[in-house]
Amino acid sequence: HFAQRYATILARNGVTLEIKASAGSLENLARLKDNEAQVGFVQGGVVPPKEDPDVEDDSGLLSLGSMFYEPVWVFYRCDKILTRLTELHGKRIAIGQEGSGVRQLARQLLDANDIPEDNHLVPLAGLGAAEELQQGRIDAAFIIAAETAPVVQVLIRSPGVKLMSFAQDRAYQRRFPFLTKLTFPRGVVDLVRDFPPDDIKVLAPTANLII
């Protein structure tokens, strides 16, 4: 989506951008390091911070800056309202495909809540995860996408599916400095139906443009 927008902008200046689909940030990073791509979006937090900030970076890669926020949406099915990830213990959770930034971040957040990597964590992403959640075959799904992305809009409007508001958003931001806390305002989806009925607190890394 964002790559296509940049391709359109660059085309106006005579620059042709070849868009390559990938599983996500980890694969993008690998392609950049292997010179299989010259420019890529990489999710904040994917590259661990250097133990010694004074040591020179020898990766050969350069960040041109943070381009936009990528909210982390945790959708779930449950009779009660959940506000903490620890409440998903023992549930079947879609955490994204291997090589994706959503999978890495989901693992970091779940590890922090003592939720082990076992057969309850399934490698589903996007609309595939949304369909499984709608059908009740999984209990929760991590989605990283813009608010306007089809998968987010589909799940927000799905009967029986709820969106988690992170009660511990400040604690996550303190523990994971690459995350920013954002608010999904009350009524933003539908003013007439007043949906969502309350502000939703979400977390978001940034997408960085790497060359």
What kind of region is each of these model predictions?
Residues 1-13, 70-135:
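Bilobed "Venus flytrap"/periplasmic-binding protein-like clamshell domains
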Residues 1-39:
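Extracytoplasmic small-molecule ligand-binding "clamshell" domains
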Residues 16-19, 29, 60-61, 91-99, ...:
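Second-shell loop/turn segments in exported
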Residues 21-25, 35-48, 126, 143-149, ...:
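Beta->alpha turn/N-cap motifs
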Residues 22, 26-38, 44-47, 58-59, ...:
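Membrane-embedded segments
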Residues 28-30, 49-52, 83-84, 102-105, ...:
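Extracytoplasmic/secreted cell-surface and envelope-processing proteins
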Residues 57-67, 191-200:
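A structural signal for short loop-to-beta-strand junctions that line the ligand-binding cleft
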Residues 111, 117-210:
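Pocket-lining segment of extracytoplasmic ligand-binding domains
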